[in-house]
Amino acid sequence: MDTENPDYYDGKSSVVWLDYMGTSAIFMGDETTETETKLMREDEEGLLDIFGVDLRSTEIVKVGHHGSAYSTSLEFLQYLHASVAVVSCGENNPYGHPTQETLARLFAMEVDVWRTDRDGHVVVTVSADGSYKTRKIK
């Protein structure tokens, strides 16, 4: 266990699923495709039902691990049916996040992509009727 290596912590962060007025979002933290696969399996087995989680209803996803190649699999995007994705990454970061592979998967699923490196702060506002609006604040 190399806790001095920053990569050690990848895949060990919180995942938050939120539902408000019928609009749901998942915040994947620094999680990878391994966690995505586990979440899909647990959802299919009904293990998330006790918490009121319905991953298949997820419309908004904050992609995992800043959009690295090891997150946001095509299978996960298909499972979620997300229409909006937020990628949190620094401008000209040394890791090349988000990767072209991840962006290609998002575009293949016709997901509306918002990126903090390009768009600045991204805000999603959900109204009382369940509708939502995504906007950027530079």
Residue ranges and their predicted role:
Residues 36-120:
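Cap/insert and terminal regions of metallo-dependent hydrolase folds
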Residues 1-60, 118-138:
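Core dinuclear metal-dependent hydrolase active-site scaffold
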